[in-house]
Amino acid sequence: MTNLEKILVLGATGNIGFTVIQTLTAAGYQVRAGVSNPEKSRALWQDNDLVDVAHFNFLDTSTYPAALEGISKVFFVRPPQLSTPKEDMFPFLRFLKERQIAHVVFVSLIGVEKNPVTPHHKIEKEMMRLALPFTFLRPSFFMQNLNTTHQEDIQKHDDLFIPAGNARTSFIDTRDIGEIAAICLMNTPQHIGQKYSITGKEALTYYEVAEKMTAILGRKITYSKPSLLRFRATIIRRGTPKAFANVMTMLYFITQMGNAKQITPTAQELLHREATSFDQYVKDYREDFG
């Protein structure tokens, strides 16, 4: 049975957004996928009658009306390249307020309440100031960062080039986050105003991550433990924009301070199953690591 509500999913082609759409449409919900390149993305859902595709760009307010037409609820993540929320994201939040959207699910960051310099903190604060009907998902570091952001170093050098020191990280699988977001959107009343800190079931050092990857992939993976400054300089030299490099470096500094090691039962409570294990993630994404 098709649900008459229509939900806008932004970042629809990303790790989280794609799972949000899969979960919602499996339950009969109509979804609009907001994407930067509709022509390229349309093929992803050509066999799914519950998905329509619309052009959307946070920086282009002219894309807002058509994307939001007939929409009751919204899911969004902050595109990593947008690091100045006041200019990049606030116009969109104000538009949601004008449209009286019934529920807005935002993927934030664990520990964000203690880190006012992060873009996520500023977005949360503005959403609360506008009195948007929010749910904040505050995940720990994504397992999928390893097969995206850090993929090249693993493929080419068998190395985790990540400035996390000896700190532990309670990694979460983005597929779990996407499923949780969909659960919240399908059960709006009980999730409005909630701020969920979402983690996996274990907190690992990157030495332990390297050991697990070595065992599963069948080749030696090392953890070189670069300094924050060396990491930042290296990724900028490789072409990462400075603003994005600064945010990444700041997040790993937060990790070094011990703020990524927290383990919560929230994922299991919302999913009604255990969170995906790190070992399972590596097995599922084995081909991405070369």
Language-model region placement:
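N-terminal Rossmann NAD(P)H-binding glycine-rich loop of SDR-like oxidoreductase domains
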Residues: 4-29
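Substrate-positioning beta->alpha
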Residues: 163-184, 194
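Glycine-/Pro-rich loop/turn segments that contact NAD(P) or position catalytic residues
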Residues: 79-159
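Substrate-binding strand-loop-helix patch
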Residues: 168-175, 199-215, 229-230, 276
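Conserved Rossmann-fold cofactor-binding substructure of NAD(P)-dependent oxidoreductases
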Residues: 54-71
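Amphipathic terminal alpha-helices
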Residues: 266, 271-290
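Terminal hydrophobic/aromatic helix or amphipathic segment near a protein terminus
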Residues: 196, 212-257
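Glycine/proline-rich active-site loop of Rossmann-fold NAD(P)-dependent oxidoreductases
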Residues: 146-152, 184-195, 261, 290
